[in-house]
Structure formats: C-alpha cells, structure tokens
C-alpha cells in the first residue's frame, strides 16, 4: 500500500487531517452535595416507595430543587445501599449489622413546641435608657404576645428548620413588634 505525504494517520504526521477534531477532554461532573432537608425528603420518599415512578420523581425533584436525574440516581444508590444492608443482616444470622438511627420525621410545616430557658441577663427589666425599648429581650408587654416557640432553637434534632417555618417565625415576630411598639 502506498501512502502519499500527509495522507497518513494523524499520529504519524503529528497534525490533524482535514475534517478531524482534536480529542475533547471528557467532562466529569462534580459530586452532588445534598442539604439536610433534601436528604430528609428523599429518605421519606424512599420509605414510601423504593421504586417511585417518573411522575413521583419529578414532583420530588421540584420540591427539593434538584434535577430529576439526580433524584433518579439517588434512588439507584439508595436501593443499592438497602440491598447491601439486607444482605448483611440476613447473612449474619442473629447478630445484625449495626445501623445508624434513621432520621426522625420532623414537622417542617410548624415550628417546634419546645422553648429555651432565658438566661438571667436576657430577661425583662428596665430599659438601659429611659424611653427606649430594651433590645436584649422582650419587654413585659411582648412576653405574652410571643407564642410558645418564640425562643425555640434554630435546630431541632440536628435538622435546620425549613425556610417556611423560619418565615413564619419572622412574620410572627414582626407582628408582635408592631403590636408592642407602634410607630410614633
């Protein structure tokens, strides 16, 4: 076989022939980091169904602000983890493999009912400057206007409160301030 100069494979001549493109660097996706809220919602959906249909996955993806393909891959990985745990538990006989406790179901729609005790220096008292409201704690008039969750922690059992709950707390706080200190 006879080759004319420049008609050989690209590796021989060191250059690219007409119509050939340089090999593209393969794009590698970064690992997805899920928020606590996303993981909680995904785990709840997994408890309901290990094989959700595409409609359910799309709904869940919209709810947790993830692409549907990320939700689909999460379910594939979660099923693999579940099968691995099942094998370990059934293969070990009476001694089951130690498992981490499941995440508790948190009532994200409403704030927690528990309240934190106030430190003595945060309690109600006379204002530092007469005529100005005390800024480090609720005054006597505000105490009753706050609900039972007024001084609730921002974390419940290690989970951050959902954005809607925080907005509700902020709205209630603003309303309480409006009732206690009307603009002059």
UniProtKB/Swiss-Prot annotation:
What does the UniProt entry say about where the protein is found? Answer: Nucleus
One example GO MF annotation = DNA-binding transcription factor activity, RNA polymerase II-specific
InterPro entries per UniProt: HD, Homeobox_CS, Homeodomain-like_sf, RAX/RAX2
Q: Name one Pfam family in it.
A: Homeodomain
GO cellular component terms attached to this protein's record: nucleus
Specify whether Secreted is a keyword of the entry.
Answer: no
User: For this UniProt entry, what is the primary localization, expressed as one broad class?
Assistant: nucleus
Spans traversing the lipid bilayer? none
Q: Where is the composition biased (Low complexity)?
A: 1-10
Q: What does this protein do?
A: May be involved in modulating the expression of photoreceptor specific genes. Binds to the Ret-1 and Bat-1 element within the rhodopsin promoter.
Q: Write out the domain note.
A: The Homeobox transactivates the Ret-1 element in the presence of CRX and NRL.
Task: Describe its partners and assembly state.
Answer: Interacts with CRX.
Kindly provide the name given to this protein in its UniProt entry.
Retina and anterior neural fold homeobox protein 2
């Amino acid at each position: 076989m006879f080759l004319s100069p420049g008609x050989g494979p690209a590796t021989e001549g060191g250059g690219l022939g007409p119509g050939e493109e340089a090999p593209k660097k393969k794009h590698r996706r970064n690992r997805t980091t899920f928020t606590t809220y996303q993981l909680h919602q995904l785990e709840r959906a997994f408890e309901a169904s290990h094989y959700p249909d595409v409609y359910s996955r799309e709904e869940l993806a919209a709810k947790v602000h993830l692409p549907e393909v990320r939700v689909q891959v999460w379910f594939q990985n979660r099923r693999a983890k579940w099968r691995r745990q099942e094998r370990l538990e059934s293969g070990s006989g009476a001694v089951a493999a130690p498992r981490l406790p499941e995440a508790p179901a948190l009532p994200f729609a409403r704030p927690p009912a528990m309240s934190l005790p106030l430190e003595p220096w945060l309690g109600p008292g006379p204002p530092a400057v007469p005529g100005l409201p005390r800024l480090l704690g609720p005054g006597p008039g505000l105490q009753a206007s706050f609900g039972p969750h007024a001084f609730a922690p921002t974390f419940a059992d290690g989970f951050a409160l959902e954005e809607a709950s925080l907005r509700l707390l902020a709205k209630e706080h603003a309303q309480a301030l409006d009732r206690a200190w009307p603009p002059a």
